[in-house]
């Protein structure tokens, strides 16, 4: 109020009025994205996420499967979609040079209103490249009966008490998603939750090991003098004392 952003004596909620035509356009579009039959939305803990590209793209088709739990009638669906997504640059289906605009919007209930939890915009190529880096960071040796790839849902349930999403810290799911899209270090809360579950359950699963490996590599990657990155298998050439001590 009474700031340099006020215009034409309009204050607070009336500072940026929009036309009826604009209101009708964005509410119609949002209702369509949030509709019951929409494939451009998914639920992330307490946040509804909607996404779209300026024109139909492969990323738009598989984006939901990368971040959600697999369908009950097809538990391997997510793994298949992620595998195709990671191979897409080599098949020419989806490449990192695609300049098609891509958007992600996170909405959360707030009293009687809806609040914007996060907003991301970039190109299909940028989002695809950052998501592939995320999966590369998570690579680890697994047994034959384990899934080849971990969706965001798999990661979050592995660090949650009783493997239930509702037991996670409020902002972890959205913070982790944004770190993936921006190709930034994972939130510290992810590491803390992972260590807590390992200590409580006395069980280091391959997913939890992958989370800690990826967290450390992403954390130190942008340092001026980063240490040698942790590999997906035992590195016999690594002489770092902390690494040798486990």
Where do the language-model regions lie?
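Extended alpha-helical scaffolding segments
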Residues: 2-246
